[in-house]
């Protein structure tokens, strides 16, 4: 006999996919004359060269992404790297809608398109892109690890001043990727991956959409005197973070 929660989980997944399919992204507001990445047909762009392919991210890949993001959030929340402790930073979960829109973005084979990516739930989503070019592409897990390592190296650039008043570059370099992973308004993430052949080179674009983004001049996260002091409930695995059920509004600014 299946556990009692299996039908409930299945129903929740069906509802989430049904909600994604029901959204008309062409009707969502976009600033200026920009288009929404979810509007129209999902086809590869001309920039994708030869043999473009969207690769499925398996559970082992999504688990890896979530584990790395939550590891660094937990590490920083307790005051590591000389950064202040976080009062109410929660565990990040996977979101299929963000992942679907990230996948649509990668099918353009350009990191920066300035397309809208907002949803009915996430009004100001953030986005990170990782481009890879080589003679041969590595396995998906190695691509993910390389992208995460790039963001992790920004720990040498980030500072308390940037946490208190965000800007994407510090005196020692870029902090955009790491600062987005540390935002306490980020509650969910979803990623997509497309590969293609560009002449003799193999190329890949990994895109991750986050439920919120940092705002210039605003705090990356609220500072506390102890890790998670404002959490209703702490997470059992990441003990310096709030649990996944913490009611944080990703659309609210600090």
From Swiss-Prot:
Family (UniProt): Belongs to the CRISP family.
Record localization: Secreted
Spans traversing the lipid bilayer: none
UniProt-listed InterPro entries: CAP_dom (IPR014044), CAP_sf (IPR035940), P14a_insect (IPR034763)
CDD domains for this protein: CAP_euk (cd05380)
Keywords, comma-separated and alphabetical: Cell adhesion impairing toxin, Hemostasis impairing toxin, Platelet aggregation inhibiting toxin, Secreted, Signal, Toxin
GO-annotated molecular function: toxin activity
Primary residence: secreted
Gene3D superfamilies reported in the protein's UniProt record: CAP
Keyword Iron: no
Organism of this sequence: Tabanus yao (Horsefly)
Lineage: Eukaryota, Metazoa, Ecdysozoa, Arthropoda, Hexapoda
Signal peptide stretch: 1-22
Residues spanned by motif Cell attachment site: 31-33
The protein's name: Tabinhibitin 6
SUPFAM superfamilies, per database record: PR-1-like
Residue ranges annotated for the SCP domain, each copy included: 66-210
GO cellular component: extracellular region
Tissue specificity annotation: Expressed in salivary glands.
Free-text function comment from the UniProt entry: Inhibits platelet aggregation induced by all agonists tested (ADP, arachidonic acid, the thromboxane A2 analog U46619, thrombin, and snake venom snaclecs (TMVA that activates platelet through GPIB, and stejnulxin that specifically acts through GPVI (GP6))). May act by competing with fibrinogen for binding to glycoprotein IIb/IIIa (ITGA2B/ITGB3).
Domain of life: Eukaryota
């Amino acid at each position: 006999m299946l556990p009692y929660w299996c039908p409930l989980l299945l129903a929740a997944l069906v509802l989430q996919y049904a909600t994604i399919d029901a959204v008309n992204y062409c009707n969502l507001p976009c600033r200026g004359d920009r288009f929404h990445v979810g509007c129209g047909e999902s086809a590869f762009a001309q920039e994708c060269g030869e043999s473009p392919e969207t690769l499925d991210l398996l559970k082992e890949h999504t688990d890896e992404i979530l584990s790395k993001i939550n590891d660094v959030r937990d590490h920083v929340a307790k005051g590591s790297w000389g950064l202040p402790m976080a009062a109410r930073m929660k565990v990040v979960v996977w979101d299929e809608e963000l992942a679907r829109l990230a996948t649509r973005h990668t099918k353009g084979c350009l990191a920066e398109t300035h397309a809208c990516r907002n949803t009915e739930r996430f009004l100001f989503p953030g986005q990170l892109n990782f481009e890879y070019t080589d003679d041969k592409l590595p396995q998906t897990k190695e691509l993910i690890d390389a992208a995460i390592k790039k963001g992790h190296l920004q720990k040498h650039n980030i500072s308390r001043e940037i946490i208190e008043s965000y800007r994407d570059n510090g005196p020692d370099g870029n902090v955009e990727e790491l600062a987005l992973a540390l935002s306490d308004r980020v509650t969910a993430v979803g990623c997509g991956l497309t590969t293609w052949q560009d002449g003799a080179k193999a190329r890949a674009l990994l895109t991750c959409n986050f439920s919120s983004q940092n705002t210039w001049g605003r705090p990356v996260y609220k500072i506390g005197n102890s890790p998670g002091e404002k959490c209703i409930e702490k997470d059992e695995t990441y003990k310096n973070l709030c649990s996944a059920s913490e009611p944080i509004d990703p659309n609210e600014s600090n």
